[in-house]
Amino acid sequence: MSLNIGVIGTGAIGQDHIRRCSKVLQGSRIVAVTDINRESATKVIRDLGIEANVYADGYEVINAKEVEAVLVTSWGPSHEEFVLAAVAAGKYVFCEKPLAVTAEGCKRIVEAEAAQGKRLVQVGFMRPYDQGYRALKDVITSGKIGEPLMLHCAHRNPRVGDNYTTSMAITDTLIHEIDVLRWLLDDDYVSVQVVFPRKAKHAKTHLRDPQVVLFETAKGTRIDVEIFVNCQYGYDIQCEVVGDSGIAKLPEPSSVLLRSEARLSNEILTDWKDRFIDAYDVELQAFINDVLAEKLTGPSAWDGFAAAVTADACIAAQESGQIVPIRLPQRPDFYDK
């Protein structure tokens, strides 16, 4: 049995997902595509040798009879309208981040989904599908290190483009930690503070880099996340969990241990795509399997909403220098079904 998928947006990530669904993953078939540049959509399916209909816009893809599930990989500000349309049509939808560009937009999606009476939306947070993070969560859940007391984390990029801003350290970079750490701890944030150390010499004039983000959770766990997007040396993700009776650390990506020229060394990756490439495959395969089973289990619209509310608080903390409360409403029981 195959799931017939329609794709809205054939840019870089859209092309990657089309390739995955048609060449790598099991149980899926791309049957419809659209892009603001129709020629781009046509070229993608031609180059991949796919027989799919090219539609004028996302609404036509959503309402096409042959489409059973939708992938939204278009421009970020268009995500909300297409997700809402898919939910209204009663179709499962996988939406790359952001779910919406505002917390209010995410809330509208949560409300629309709840009105349908079943989960229809999955958000494209891929780190919960990374083998290393899953192993780390297994250790935490097992109780081997006791209750988590502190987390020390880092998200480092070698460099960023000239258009990267201080707030993008939250919305484009930290957003992944915001989601995955909630998932790791099964806990919500209650406050955040952002501290700016001495500025890195490679940071552009308009960018404050690095940053240290300090969270407190509802259960009292303290989290510090270093965001350093001009570290120069590579793409480096770190996460160390300090518990009552032990410490668990996110494993490093597998690489050859090299002994050469009087040195012992491991390679450090430089591209985020290489670091999480397998997680993207696992994530989308899980979505396909869940839709065929008619029960989504991945990151939900509520997770997207929680991430947006938290990101807004982080930006407020950047601007004020104060500890900012993070106020999430009660999660609907709908998401516990």
From Swiss-Prot:
Domain of life: Bacteria
Keyword Oxidoreductase appears in the UniProt entry: yes
InterPro entries: Gfo-Idh-MocA_inositol_DH (IPR050424), Gfo/Idh/MocA-like_OxRdtase_C (IPR004104), Gfo/Idh/MocA-like_OxRdtase_N (IPR000683), MI/DCI_dehydrogenase (IPR023794), NAD(P)-bd_dom_sf (IPR036291)
Protein's UniProt keywords contain Oxidoreductase: yes
Catalytic activity as recorded in UniProt: myo-inositol + NAD(+) = scyllo-inosose + NADH + H(+)
UniProt keyword terms in alphabetical order: NAD, Oxidoreductase
Pfam families named in the record: GFO_IDH_MocA, GFO_IDH_MocA_C
GO BP field: inositol catabolic process
Family annotation (Gene3D superfamilies): Dihydrodipicolinate Reductase, domain 2, NAD(P)-binding Rossmann-like Domain
EC numbers, comma separated: 1.1.1.18
Annotated GO MF terms: inositol 2-dehydrogenase (NAD+) activity; nucleotide binding
Quaternary organization: Homotetramer.
Role, per record: Involved in the oxidation of myo-inositol (MI) to 2-keto-myo-inositol (2KMI or 2-inosose).
Stated family: Belongs to the Gfo/Idh/MocA family.
UniProt name for this protein: Inositol 2-dehydrogenase
Protein species of origin: Yersinia enterocolitica serotype O:8 / biotype 1B (strain NCTC 13174 / 8081)
Taxonomy of the source species: Bacteria, Pseudomonadati, Pseudomonadota, Gammaproteobacteria, Enterobacterales
